[in-house]
Structure formats: structure tokens, C-alpha cells
Amino acid sequence: MERSMYAGRVRSEHIGTTITLKGWVSRRRNLGGLIFIDLRDREGLMQLVVNPENTDAAVVETAESLRSEFVIEVTGTVEAREQANDNLPTGAVELKVEDLKVLNTAKTTPFEIKDGVEASDDTRMRYRYLDLRRPEMLENFKLRAKVTHTIRNYLDDLEFIDVETPMLTKSTPEGARDYLVPSRVSQGHFYALPQSPQITKQLLMNAGFDRYYQIVKCFRDEDLRGDRQPEFTQVDLETSFLNEQEIQDITEGLIAKVMKETKGVEVTLPFPRMSYDDAMNNYGSDKPDTRFDMLLQDLTELVKDVDFKVFAEAPAVKAIVVKGNADKYSRKSIDKLTDFAKQFGAKGLAWVKMTDGVLAGPVAKFLTSIEEKLTDALQIEENDLVLFVADTLEIANNTLGALRNQIAKELDMIDNTKFNFLWVVDWPMFEWSEEEGRYMSAHHPFTLPTEDSAAELEGDLSKVRAVAYDIVLNGYELGGGSLRINQKDLQERMLKALGFSEESAYEQFGFLLEAMDYGFPPHGGLALGLDRFVMLLAGKDNIREVIAFPKNNKASDPMTQAPSLVADKQLEELALHVELENE
């Protein structure tokens, strides 16, 4: 028989009607001579009732045989429950079973199909198809679908054109490691899976498309963490003839529309702006979480004459004040914070507490000469804990920024009902890579430098600023964009500044440079991380919760066992030979 409706949508207005439902057995129990079955489908649970006294014996026998996760088809009459269950949307009704069929049986599942499941991440991923049956997971993907639907409608209304760009493209430097795909036809040659459609979307602007968008898969072979996956989805935009403010306005409108449609939240526009330098100096992060205070304070000048070499000789001394919580931090717990700080390059962590109106702690004796000034500068009060880092400015900022976030989580200082958006602007064009021993693009090599700093491409690269902008939500980079270079000579200068010879520049990017000979318009754009956005909207802390079939922290899939070895014949066709490290 045809299904009449979803089980989770049966309501009081259906009382007295005969319906057919199909789904999974969530549980079965015998009580007071009756058999109760909870039927689950994607819309929720519905209680079924089998009364052996007035039900066909074959139906009763089938009902008795049911186990969790059996797939069934049931027909019956909707009746009012004697005692309503206010915890269920269907709690006012139940289905009096008249016919029952088992469509498929099921083994005992490795974990219970319910929210709050107690199973390891790898077990959940090994049986992802079972994990996805849980109501919480289904809701995540309904939310994701609503977000993408809203985005498409918004951009379609603004006359953006949805264009698919290639998945098999050219490997280019300046970025994370590429995923490579060997060519069978051109042996020894490789495609790369795109880290983003950056160059192709710029070429679409040269083609006159004017406004492009795509919800697109991207790939990066990088170390993983909670908000990263090797394959991810981004909302990709590019426009011609718009300035950065106009692009930001479009983005803000898109986000406001998504927030209203999916969360019922009215966000205030325009979003706040914060310079990159202010973000790093005050929050210790280029993606600051502004839902709580505890800003970084610069004490370099104040402590330069104290009798404590660690402070007096450090290039920078900065601090954060943990207000009113010093009593929660014993020496042992501060030692743990010190170990945490060392992960970010700090040599150690100095601290003092305000106890009975005076500063106490290992370094307090070195600060007596400036205690009053220090107390005033930091507004230290009773039961405050002050944490200091003395090092380079970069290490001090990064370390205290990470400590700030860690402590806020430990002390439950963050209001998780808030959605704090902001733009981080005025970015440096380059960042120094200790590993590479050279300057690298802070974003990518096609970012437009500011007009007043472009001359430094042949001088001090640390002084070059970019017409770039990142959008941040609650301490996460939601996306980033920039105006792009559209003049060939400037693009050549940019590549030269990054260490490309003329020959290597044309070998890697010749097709883009050639395109700049043919009337390339001014253009710019942005990309938003869809997975990360949905994760934050769903209140999760790992994007695996909003990706149907994600990879684990080893970039592998416990369900399909990907990546896997392949047959020698396949390798021979590709003219490849694999040597494993342990061979």
C-alpha cells in the first residue's frame, strides 16, 4: 500500500482516519496486555498499539516478532491517546494497528539509535548510515538543506549565475597540499582536485558573466581538526565592477537572510569592522570571538625597568585578566595552562593573583615597584588572576589569544545563544613562513594590494596591505574574500615578490596572465564555508556533525575503508609504482 503520510506528522486532526505508515521500529514493549510500538521515520515518532483481543492473530504474531530497527509497513486508525505525551509532537494520538508487515529485519545495532548516543566517533562513522537515523542528525541535514535553498534563492534574486567549474584542474603552488589525480592518457602527468575555484571564477569575470556563484566541493590535503575536513563545501561568489563595500553588503544580506529563514534571528546590519592589527593585538586572533571580554593588554613599556629579566628584556609583554576566578585556579591547574601555552611557542606563563588586596604569586615580588600602576592599568580586583606572556609580539598574541578562548570555555563565560558577526579588514598581503624561510600569501597570490602599499612589492613585503576581508562568526572564520588583481604587470610583480621567476610564473599561471591581455575587468569576491556555517547554526563544535559522510582525523573513512590500496593493474595503467615506507 502507499504511505499516507510521515509518521512524525500525524496530529489530532487525523483522529478517525485510516492511514498507512512506513518506517523503522524504534522500540517495542508489552504493557497491560497490549503491544506498544514506536515507529520512527525522518519526521519523528508515532506510537502504534496492538490489542491482541480484537486484532488478527497473524498481526499479533508479527508484532511480537518485531525488534529494534525492523522496517515495517502498518495500517490502522488514528485514535486519541488516553494519556497524551507532551514531549512528542505526535503525543496526542496513536495508531490502532489493523495490518502489519515486516519489510525487512535488522541485526542488533552497534549503538542505540537515539540522541545522546554513547559510541566512539569511529564507531559512529563505521556505521554512519545508522548514525544518520538519529533524529538529531536528521535535523542537522534538514537545516543544511534549508540553508543552501535560502542561499540559492537570495543569489538568484540578485541575478548571480550558478556555474560549475572543473573538478580536474591544474596543480598550482601557494596553498595547502593538493590532492593529485594521475592521468592515464598523459602518463606521468597529474590533475589536482581544486582547493577552490579561485582562478576559474576569475576567468568567468573575464568572460563577462559579471556575477557568479556556486555551492562547490573543494579539497585540501592538510592536517585536520574539528572545523576542517579534506573535502568541504563552500559558497563561492565572484563579481565584476563592485568595490569591497558592495561585496560585503551582498554577503551581509545573504547571511541576514539565512539567519532569518533558518533561526528566526534578526541580525543587525552592517556588521562591525575590525582591523587585522586590532584583532591580533586585542584578541590574539585573526578570528576574534567577541561574545566575551578578557582582552589582551600590552605591558611592554610598563615592565621594561622591573628587576625581572624575563619581562625587562622581552620584545613584548602582554597579559590577560581572568576576572573574579582566581580561586578556581590552583598551581596545578595553572601548570596545565602553562603546558597549553607552550604549544603556541611560549617559553612559559607568569602569573599573579589579587588576594586580600595585594598581588601574590611567583612573580609578584618582581612587580612591587609597579604594583599600583599595574593594578590601575589592568583594573585588577580581588580574586582576579593575571596571566603574562613575555616573548615576541606574535607569540605573545597567539598564546594569550588561545588561552583567552580556552579559559572562557573552562569557566563557561560564553553566551552560546549569541551570533556575533564581524569583518576583519586591512590585512597584510604576506605572512612570514618559518618553515619555508620566505614570505607567503596571507590569502592567495591574486589578491589586490592597496594602492598606497603596492610599491613595497619591490621593497619591504611586511608593509604591503591587501584589499582583503574575512567574515568571522563566534571565533570561527566563516569565509574570506578580496578584490583581485586584473592588471597583468601588477600580477607579474606579485608573483615575482613571492619568489616566482618569470619562467615559473608563466609555467604555473600563464593561462591567467594571458587572459589579462584581453580586457580583464576589475573584480572581487568571497567564499563562505558552508559546513562551518551550518555547524555553528546547529550549535555543534565539529563539522562532521553536518557532513553526511565525513572523514576522521586521519582523513580516512572507517565505513568504506577509504583511502585503500588499488590493484597492480590499475597502477600499471597509470605508469605508477608505489613504494610503502615500511617496505
Swiss-Prot record:
One of its GO terms (biological process) is aspartyl-tRNA aminoacylation. It catalyses: tRNA(Asp) + L-aspartate + ATP = L-aspartyl-tRNA(Asp) + AMP + diphosphate. It is an enzyme of class 6 (ligase). SUPFAM superfamilies: Class II aaRS and biotin synthetases (SSF55681), GAD domain-like (SSF55261), Nucleic acid-binding proteins (SSF50249). Residues 198-201 are annotated as: Aspartate. One of its GO terms (molecular function) is catalytic activity, acting on a protein. Disulfide bonds: none annotated. Its EC number is 6.1.1.12. Belongs to the class-II aminoacyl-tRNA synthetase family. Type 1 subfamily. HAMAP family: Asp_tRNA_synth_type1. GO terms for cellular component: cytoplasm. Homodimer. It holds the Pfam family tRNA-synt_2. Catalyzes the attachment of L-aspartate to tRNA(Asp) in a two-step reaction: L-aspartate is first activated by ATP to form Asp-AMP and then transferred to the acceptor end of tRNA(Asp). InterPro entries: Aa-tRNA-synt_II, aa-tRNA-synth_II, aa-tRNA-synth_II/BPL/LPL, Asp-tRNA-ligase_1, Asp-tRNA-ligase_1_N, Asp/Asn-tRNA-synth_IIb, AspRS_core, GAD-like_sf. Its main location: cytoplasm. ATP binds at R220, D221, E222, Q229, E477, G529, L530, D531, R532. L-aspartate binds at E174, R220, H443, R484. It is found in: Cytoplasm. This is Aspartate--tRNA ligase. Keywords: Aminoacyl-tRNA synthetase, ATP-binding, Cytoplasm, Ligase, Nucleotide-binding, Protein biosynthesis. Gene3D superfamilies: Bira Bifunctional Protein, Domain 2, GAD-like domain, Nucleic acid-binding proteins.
